[in-house]
């Protein structure tokens, strides 16, 4: 049977082991604080709105290797064989690395599974802290200059890219860049951005690798900032950036980046498939199809955020998976499909088992790909 690489994004904020997380979540359990205290905000929401769910596994510390051994086994049992860790660099140092370094990479079963990094190079804003999310303020900027990027690249090369469990395409470690506009803005120009990515390729070769597979996270051209962190702008279009910079492929992070998510999932799906087809014909770069579970980031706010995906249970999610499988079979030699997400609880787009659907989303993946 054909092997598919089903890669779920991981939001590494469910731990209190890094001191800087307490800026946003002072209780010391990471963003579980927001999930656990959901009752605090429900009286502020419109009549009829509810968010009644809890994690079946509990409010676990994902920087604990024993927890991650359990999660790895559950993922593999259901067909998820790659984790894409959101990776952050703020104030000249990494942020939220603990879940990867101390959880996943210290788990006994880590080599059964692959992982790669998505550099989440957006600004860190107050939206992660429900107390101040209504007053969006930048705490740390996500853009970096060339010298800072060299520090980042060397960290990737020495700490991650050479690991046997690091996900590679044609022997090249894959790294994804979330906010290409912020990347270009930090470098100062498209030319400098290109120089930085070429430098990374050269350093990888010096380290004995055949290079790096650099992936762009594709956004829409006229995207609303519904996530609260996606505010970067650039003179190029997204497709022009994809073509002019040495990216090897692209994918998406979330439906919210390119379509109206404030409707039923059944209505969203045709637009998602149309976006895949647009990228198939609009670029020679490989597009890896993306499937999101849904969208509702109301847990992060006292006020009501009206972009809410409705009727997005496991059955209709499975329809999206079948469509992505068909696209991968018909178009790509590498059968990689990205999923949002493993654990984005406060955006209500997660595979984690909960008190509403149990293991329903994972079981949908298993039915399609195993």
Residue locations for each model-derived region?
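Glycan-processing catalytic domains of CAZymes
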Residues: 1-370
